[in-house]
Amino acid sequence: TAIAHLESCRHRLNLTIKGDVLVHRVLFDGKRATGIQAESGGETFIIEGDEIILSAGAIASPQLLMLSGVGPDGNLGSVGITPVHTLEGVGQNLKNHPSLSLRFQPKAGYSLPPDSPRNQVVLRFAATGSSTRNDIQVQPLTSGPKGKEADEIRVGCRLELPESAGELTLTSADPSVQPKLDYQSLVQTQDRERMREAVRTCVRVFGHQGFDGIIEERISPSENDLASDASLDAWLDRNIGVAGHTCGTCKMGPASDPSSVVDQYCRVHG
């Protein structure tokens, strides 16, 4: 965004870019947004405008709406915020890619260098019975700081389009306190079945004799983990995480949809 849009216009007289600012809430006149209250360098101040654009991502956008009194009454009331406008869909429909790693011990000379590209896609396929093409993504991973990686090969499995959806809720009226993220990963049976297949497919692929000269042994999951659906489910639950694409918490849709938050022009309903 900075390279594509800001760099060429950052010197315009009618544009101010200010970093290190924490927005506390959106200000309203009735149900019309008129400005924001923010903090920077220990100073709290108000910025007003004819149009207030909230573009803070899938975590901070619903958080700011709720801190401003726009959201589900139950969650707002639980942290002492007086509702300005009840909108039950704010923070709902929280989604991300369920993601986990298989771990292998490499033979001498075949460790994955920590400065390798973060993601290197090696395999995409559709799980059995899936209506989504190529809904499983597999790639070798590096993630730690240079020189801090364990001497192992990690292979990431990612479910690209999950059915499961969770919610984001406030735990405090303090804008500096992170909200609670409950992704409900693999709650839907189809998601769990697809993830089981992804893991078993990776075990089979990386157990092929073509990798005998590279991989010494599989560290995780173990043979006991793979012995049954129940044992594999337990391993999934211990290891499941999410990838970097949180979305859905300010859903676009018609006002008649109680789970939607904005219309086709990204205007908040109500």
Predicted regions and their residues:
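Loop/turn elements at helix/coil->beta-strand transitions in domains of secreted/extracellular proteins
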Residues: L13-T16, G49-D50, G270
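Non-transmembrane alpha-helical segments in soluble domains
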Residues: L6-E7, P62-L65, D73, R196-V203
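Conserved redox-cofactor binding core of oxidoreductases
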Residues: T1-G41, S101-Q105, P113, P221-S222, ...
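General small-molecule cofactor/ligand-binding pocket signal
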Residues: T16-K18, T82-T86, Q139
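FAD-dependent oxidoreductase catalytic-site/capping-region signature
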Residues: K107-S111, R118, V122-G270
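Glycine-rich loop(s) and the adjacent beta-strand/alpha-helix scaffold that form part
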Residues: R25-V26, G35-P114, A173
